[in-house]
Amino acid sequence: MPKLQLSELLSLNKVEQILRLAEINTELEQLTAQERVSWALDNLEGKPAVSSSFGIQAAVMLQLVTDVKSDTPVILTDTGYLFPETYQFIDTLTERLNLNLQVFTADETPMWQEARYGKLWEQGVDGLKHYNRLNKVQPMRRALDQLQVGVWFSGLRRDQSSSRSHLPILSIQNGVFKFLPVIDWSNQEVHYYLEEKGLPYHPLRDEGYLSVGDTHTTQKWEPGMKEEDTRFFGLKRECGLHEDDAEAEGSGI
C-alpha cells in the first residue's frame, strides 16, 4: 500500500479533503494508541518527530512513539522560563528513554525580550500572544523546517480543555501531517499506562500542579478550577503551537 502523500490530500478541493480525512479518522478511532502510532509511521509520507513540553504526563507520548521508532526526534521549544523541576525531568526522561532530544529556542534570549518588550506575560492576551509567538510558535516552525518533518506527533487529549474537545487524530497543520494518538484517552487511561510501563509523572504533580509550562504563567490547581484555568491566568489555554499559522496570527490561540 503506497504511503498517504500530503500533496495528494492538498490537491483535493476542501470538501473532498475533509471527507477523505474523516474517512481515515473513522478507521483510526477503532485502533489502540500503539496501533495508531504504527499506522502513522507505516502509512504517512515524511519524516516523523514528536513535540513535547515535558509536562505532567509527557512520558506517555515519548514512550509510545520511541518504542516503535527509537530515533524519532523529540522537539522541545525551550522558553528559558521552565521550572527547574522541568529541566530535571527532561534530563531524567532523555536518559531513561534514550531520547533523540532536539532543543529549539527563540532568536532573542529571555533577557533581550524583557529589555525590548517588557514582561509580555503581564500584558494581557495580546502580550501572551506575542510571547508565545516568539518563544513557542516560531521556534517550532524552525524545528519542523530544519528537521524536515512530515509527520508531527503530539500528546494532546480532548479532555484537557474545551479547545481540544473536537480535535481529530489525523489532520494537516502548517504543511505537515499532525497526528494525535492519545487524543481520546482519559486521565485514568494515562495513569494506567504510566503505571504499566513504570514511567514517572512530572515531579510537580505531587505539589498540586495539573499542567506545567513556564514559571510565570503556571499555577497550582485550586478547588473549583478546571485544568485549563491553571495556565495563562485562565485567559487562554493554548500556546499557539497547535494551530495553523494563519489562525495564530489572527483570532488567537
From Swiss-Prot:
Entry annotation: catalytic residues: C239 (nucleophile)
In Pfam terms, one family for this protein is: PAPS_reduct
Q: What Enzyme Commission number(s) does the record list for this chain?
A: 1.8.4.8
> What domain of life?
Bacteria
Q: Principal place where this protein is found?
A: cytoplasm
CDD domains on file: PAPS_reductase
Q: Which UniProt keywords apply?
A: Cytoplasm, Oxidoreductase
- State its location(s): Cytoplasm
Q: Which family does it belong to?
A: Belongs to the PAPS reductase family. CysH subfamily.
- What role is this protein assigned? Catalyzes the formation of sulfite from phosphoadenosine 5'-phosphosulfate (PAPS) using thioredoxin as an electron donor.
Q: What is this protein called?
A: Phosphoadenosine 5'-phosphosulfate reductase
Q: Which organism is it from?
A: Aliivibrio salmonicida (strain LFI1238)
